[in-house]
Amino acid sequence: MEEFQVYLELNRSRRHDFLYPLIFREYIYALAHDHGLNKSMIFFENQGYGNKFSSLIVKRLIIRMDQQNHLIISANDSNQNPFFGHNNNLYSQMISAGFAVIVEIPFSLRLVSYSQGEEVAKSHNLQSIHSIFPFLEDKFSHLNYVLDVLIPHPIHLEILVQALRYWVKDASSLHLLRFSLYEYCNLKSFITPKKSISIFNPRLFLFLYNSHACEYESIFLFLRNQSSHLRSTSSGAFLERIYFYGKIEYLVEVFYNDFQNNLWLFKDPFIHFIRYQGKAILASKDTSLLMNKWKYYFVDLWQYYFYMWSQSGRVRINQLSKYSLDFLGYLSSVRLNPSVVRSQMLENSFIIDNAMKKLDTRIPIISLIGSLSKAKFCNTLGHPISKPTWADSSDSDIIDRFVRICRNLSHYHSGSSKKKSLYQIKYILRFSCVKTLARKHKSTVRAFLKRLGSEFLEEFFTETEEEHVFSLIFPRVFFTSRKLYRGRIWYLDIICINALVNHE
């Protein structure tokens, strides 16, 4: 029992004193500057975090606070207080940015020390969105069912604050965070953070959300590792940990001593959990009955342990062979790849039908066309239209914009099993570019193309350097006349989802 208690016990060494009065002192700026917190954010350079929020904003916060000299704040007098007057949004941004810098200090230092090791290249690769797909190719073909989980949001802001109590021992920091959340966010805008993101630092919001998710994922990891015993343990017994530990001790002793040869019936090594964009995937080789058990484990865990309202309808059980999973801009499914093998034994020959499971990743063409339609590159049917807002730019600038979008989409969707949909997207962008240029020069599309020749805009279909290398390695199988590499390529340098890919 002590082993399980140690496992569930959070690592107390990770707790830090985030004294929020530090943001009012001069030396916190020196601390942040000396450790190079901005440079340590190596995985978020493309998001422009270092350009908008840095340790310099903490310096400005210190100066502004000293000038205002309003450190004692009353929530009832927030409308009259000059600290929360017409500059309330500005001060909220400064406070949230300063708080984000403070809470990220230990994590940034840990990241810097880790990046100085020999495995820095590996850590970069693991940050890529595409790094999960080779894992799915290896694992999903052996699995049967998948739970498509819509993660519930906390029903109260206090839950997010309390999620930090294992990480932050200083009550003052929690009071500052609690005050800021209640002062500037209501529950509705926080669940759909379009308004709150403009006020609060996005990294602070993500830090709170991930800290909360870390708690229930650590318990789920315990469930996953002990799934061989939990199959005969109800969720109610799990929540009452005394009975839970007692039942596990009994099961371990009985199974190990008397039924050691039959342990494989109760173990489940083929279970995998992935969390992304407020959703989660639980894939397993279990039967539908056992997957239904996992479904109610999730619901009960969220409702009774983390006080998050959840219903069984938010967790759907699907069979991988009959279901396409909408996952990170791809429709992923497991399909059978039939093959016929002829075997010869002496004078007799046999025809053997062999079907192998293979992960199929396709582009959600309908959703992607919908995204292109919202961006005014085509209509709802996928017919290209001109981009009038770009008609005032130079020809080279217009072409460069379209080519850059086309290559970004090609780069992200390079792992598609079927390139026909990708070619259709390139076709839409190519003729949208032509129509935009024709609109600018007050000409028709046919006359414009006839004047420039058929080689115009060939760079839309020009292969990238990576595709050129693969075409040299596999020239007969994978290289086509359209200069499209037909094999799947997963790039390990993609850390952000393109806005057109994230069509939701």
Swiss-Prot record:
Report the GO terms under cellular component: chloroplast
- Cellular compartments annotated: Plastid, Chloroplast
List the Pfam families. Answer: Intron_maturas2, MatK_N
Which GO terms of type biological process are on file?
A: mRNA processing; RNA splicing; tRNA processing
Alphabetically ordered keywords of this record: Chloroplast, mRNA processing, Plastid, RNA-binding, tRNA processing
Residue ranges of the TM segments: none
Question: Which GO terms fall under molecular function for this chain's record?
Answer: RNA binding
Role played: Usually encoded in the trnK tRNA gene intron. Probably assists in splicing its own and other chloroplast group II introns.
UniProt record similarity statement: Belongs to the intron maturase 2 family. MatK subfamily.
| Name the record gives this protein | Maturase K
